[in-house]
Every structure is written in C-alpha cells, then in structure tokens.
Amino acid sequence: KQGRRPMLVACDIYRPAAIDQLQVVGKQAGAPVFTLPGAKPPEIARKALAHAKDYGNDIVILDTAGRLQIDEVLMQELVDIKEAVPVDETLLVVDAMAGQDAVNVAKTFNETVGVDGIILTKTDGDTRGGAALSVLAVTGKPIKFQGVGEKLDDLEVFHPSRMASRILGMGDVLSLIERAQDAADEKAAEETAKRMLENKFDMNDM
C-alpha cells in the first residue's frame, strides 16, 4: 500500500514447517522470503541484509523463533542477531490469549533484547484487553498493531480508545464500521453503521 519493497527473512530454524508457513505468507503478501538452510540466525540475518541491498528491498523483516516461556538460549540468539545487523525496530508479537506467560515473556524480552513496540494477536477472542494492559504495564512500550483474525488483512493499527471500549464491555463498533467501509461503498457503510448503533443490524446487513 505504501509502495515499499519488503522482504521476509526466515530466522526460525527450530519449529517444524516455520519456513514453509512464512513462504505461504510471503506469497500472499507478494513479498520474497529469504532462507539459508543450515545457517544460524545471526548469519541468516547478515546474508539477508546483503541480499536485500543487492535486490532493492527497502524493508527487511526478520521472523525469529516464538517463545511462550522464557528461554535463555533463544533470548541470547536475539541479542546475537542485534549485534550482527543494524536493527531499526524490534517488535514483540504477543498472544492475547496466553495470559501470564505472555506478560512474563514480554518483561524478560524487553529487559534482555529491548522492545520498540508490541503486536497483539488474537484480540478477536474473549480476553477483551487484559493482556494489552498487562504487557503495556511491564514494558512501557506502545502496542502498534493488533491481529483480529488469521488473514493478512486482519492486521490492524492498534487504537487504545477502542480497546478501552472493549474492556468496558462496549464493543468495538468503529473497527466494524471501518471493515464495512472496505467491503462496501461509503453510503452503504454509513447506513450499516447507523443500523449497528440502533441495534438493528441483521443477517441481511451481514
């Protein structure tokens, strides 16, 4: 959408099918995926950066191994990656359904590696916003994006005011309106929004 040329880099060498899954995402997004079988993540990152410069990719996204519990080896691996290549931004992806484990990982991740922002996934679940508040409290870093589903289009810019509404049990009507606008013309979206606010939204509107 912004005319950039991103490249994804497969630095998760541990989880089975991680590279295959990243390649599927890359294909859907129209972005190349850099892989280097047999290499360690810091070396993969270095080679990927050189490759990106040669092929004109102006954004390089390093996909590293996920961690649901605190793992010193994997944490050190992230430190090694940041020492191997210049990193402009470090984003921690947090599962909103993971509870206290997510909070513990976020705290250790920020203390060990340093976090610039958070991506909160599975915010379409029933947890409302407890994870958002907890992660924000322990890291002091902003939540930049939220995942509301499994598709690429389900990654949205995070709006604190809308999460506050969810926590208070008011729902997130504005996000529903935005998604309706993407799928329909403006007049139809306005009518749909009006029906939502009047509690007249039915299966025909859906």
Give the positions of each predicted feature.
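Structural and coupling elements of P-loop NTPases
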Residues: 21-24
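Post-Walker A helix-loop "phosphate-sensing" segment adjacent to the P-loop in P-loop NTPases
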Residues: 1-7, 140
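Switch II (G3) loop of P-loop NTPases
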Residues: 6-18, 28-85
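Conserved phosphate-handling catalytic cores of large alpha/beta enzymes
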Residues: 46-48, 57, 69, 75-83, ...
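Short, composition-biased local secondary-structure segments
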Residues: 1, 19, 101-105
